[in-house]
């Protein structure tokens, strides 16, 4: 059986919290920000949790987290 490895791209994007939820950054805030309202950009600040439907995929990419 081959060695299990962490997907490094996923390790840079996700953080597993002690309770088991996975934290991720918000999308749509890197560029083309001039046409977005201040309120919209403000709501994109901070991190949010990965949705339940994507959780198994993310955990499979992070076997040691």
From Swiss-Prot:
Disulfide bonds: none
Alphabetic keyword roster: Ribonucleoprotein, Ribosomal protein
GO cellular component term, pick one: cytosolic large ribosomal subunit
Coiled-coil segments: none
InterPro entries per the UniProt record, alphabetical: Ribosomal_bL35, Ribosomal_bL35-like, Ribosomal_bL35_CS, Ribosomal_bL35_sf
UniProt KW Cytoplasm keyword: no
Molecular function terms from GO: structural constituent of ribosome
Similarity remark: Belongs to the bacterial ribosomal protein bL35 family.
Listed name of the protein: Large ribosomal subunit protein bL35
């Amino acid at each position: 059986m081959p060695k299990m490895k962490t997907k490094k791209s996923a390790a840079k994007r996700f953080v597993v919290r002690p309770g088991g939820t996975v934290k991720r950054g918000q999308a749509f805030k890197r560029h083309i920000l001039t046409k977005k309202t201040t309120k919209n950009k403000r709501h994109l600040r901070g991190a949010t949790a990965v949705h339940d439907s994507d959780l198994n995929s993310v955990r499979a990419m992070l076997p040691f987290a």
